[in-house]
Amino acid sequence: NFVEEHRSFFEPLHPSFFELTTAMAFRYFADQKVDVAVIEVGMGGRLDCTNIIHPDLCVITNIGLDHTQYLGDTLTKIAKEKAGIIKEGVPVVIGRAQGAVKRVFTMKAKEKNAPIEYARENARYWDMEIVPYSKLQEIRPMMDNTIQSMHEMIEAMDEQSEEEANQMRQALLMLDLSDSLRTLDQILDKRKDAIKIHNEMFPFGLFTELSGAYQFENMFTILKALATLTRLNYNIRSQDYRAGLANVCQLTGLMGRWQKVHSYPDIICDTGHNVDGIEYIHVQLNAIHKTFDQEIHIVFGMVSDKDISSVLELLPKDATYYFTKASVKRAMPEDELMKMALEA
């Protein structure tokens, strides 16, 4: 109905599939009267069709060499395109950025009078680690024991000082341990590895079902963005942090991000397709290989407009490879991919 209603407007413009579906999404959000819409840029930023909105917050994630034929062949050129989403007076959070890339964002934010924050600036206040499923199973009873000990302390205090006991009860409420247990149980039910994030605010940790090493950078960006939204009077509670991070895939439909699709043997699916993404995958594969001395088998395919040679150079040399071609026009034939791999 949407397309038919607006056909006379759209046809002279010859919109792309992405432009048309973006317009449909905006209409759907408006009709549903959503409280918050998270709009992801399709590519770049400055010229992207999503760049007509006036948001409460802009977020620019980590800059990598991708879509170089459209955005430019250097990180600085790509950063200038990304910086095009920075709006007059609208706060902006930047993921990993340094050197010339950071200067691009800083200058653009100054030009637009936009408050700017870098996610990495507060990284020292957060500890993060990848926790295997087996280790998560050990953490669960430890948390139970901690809660039990605190309740026993409160009961003992009640006999001596009601005021101190009430203070301890308040501290227990602030820690919100029952909610921590609930979200940990949700991840345990999925039989997944997790990333544990903790600091003074969350001493028993936040757990996210995303366990790719590259998610560390994303977590810093998320936490900074949530803190900024809180300052903008968004009512984001500690249990919202926990529930959101523990159920990312269910809430968003996210797939293919270091996604374990089978155990014994472990089968992991990842859609990394540029040098930055593959570097993280390479590090994590090496860690698995060294820790568990497991053989690695890789089913590998790419589209032809990516920097395939640079990606192949990063992949482990001692793995067994199965080259494949996806059912899309841009996919590189498997025999050509294998030839490039042998030369890498």
Feature annotation, model-predicted:
Residues 1-53, 69-71, 99-100:
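ATP-dependent carboxylate-amine ligase catalytic core
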Residues 31, 36-41, 49-51, 55-59, ...:
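Nucleotide phosphate-binding/pyrophosphate-handling subdomain across enzymes
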Residues 45-47, 54-112:
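Conserved catalytic-core segment of NTP-binding enzymes
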Residues 95-96, 110-136, 185-186, 209-212, ...:
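Beta-strand->loop->alpha-helix junctions that form or flank phosphate-binding loops
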Residues 98-104, 108, 192, 266-268, ...:
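C-terminal helical cap/extension that packs against the catalytic core
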Residues 125-129, 137, 141, 188-202:
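Acidic-glycine-rich active-site phosphate/pyrophosphate-binding loop
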Residues 136, 143, 147-150, 165-168, ...:
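Generic L/I/V-rich hydrophobic alpha-helical segments across diverse proteins
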Residues 156-166:
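Charged, low-complexity interaction regions
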